[in-house]
């Protein structure tokens, strides 16, 4: 009772084809296939074998310079 046989699925398929039509189902299939292909292409672009080149770190300023500039700006206001 809980399991559907192949005949149940065929009847459901026939009803769906009658409701939506074969053209609409074909368009849905093409859209779904295009979405899957786009997803796979996106995954391939993200998995490149090229090692990521680290960006050179900028030289850090002395932290007192920022504090001095902030104090000077607050005095001017």
Curated annotation (Swiss-Prot):
Pfam families: TatA_B_E. The chain crosses the membrane at residues 1-21. Coiled coil: none annotated. GO terms for cellular component: TAT protein transport complex. Its main location: membrane. The keyword Thylakoid does not apply. InterPro entries: TatA/B/E, TatA/E. Residues 58-77 have a biased composition (Basic and acidic residues). GO terms for molecular function: protein transmembrane transporter activity. Keywords: Cell inner membrane, Cell membrane, Membrane, Protein transport, Translocation, Transmembrane, Transmembrane helix, Transport. Gene3D superfamilies: 1.20.5.3310. It is a single-pass membrane protein. Residues 40-77 are annotated as: Disordered. One of its GO terms (biological process) is protein transport by the Tat complex. It is found in: Cell inner membrane. The keyword Acyltransferase does not apply. HAMAP family: TatA_E. Belongs to the TatA/E family. The Tat system comprises two distinct complexes: a TatABC complex, containing multiple copies of TatA, TatB and TatC subunits, and a separate TatA complex, containing only TatA subunits. Substrates initially bind to the TatABC complex, which probably triggers association of the separate TatA complex to form the active translocon. Part of the twin-arginine translocation (Tat) system that transports large folded proteins containing a characteristic twin-arginine motif in their signal peptide across membranes. TatA could form the protein-conducting channel of the Tat system. This is Sec-independent protein translocase protein TatA.
């Amino acid at each position: 009772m809980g399991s559907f046989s192949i005949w149940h699925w065929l009847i459901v398929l026939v009803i769906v084809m009658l409701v939506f039509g074969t053209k609409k189902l074909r368009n849905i299939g093409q859209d779904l296939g295009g979405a899957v292909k786009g997803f796979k292409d996106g995954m391939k672009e993200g998995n490149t074998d090229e090692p990521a080149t680290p960006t050179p770190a900028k030289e850090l300023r002395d932290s007192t310079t920022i504090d001095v500039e902030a104090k000077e700006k607050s005095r001017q206001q």
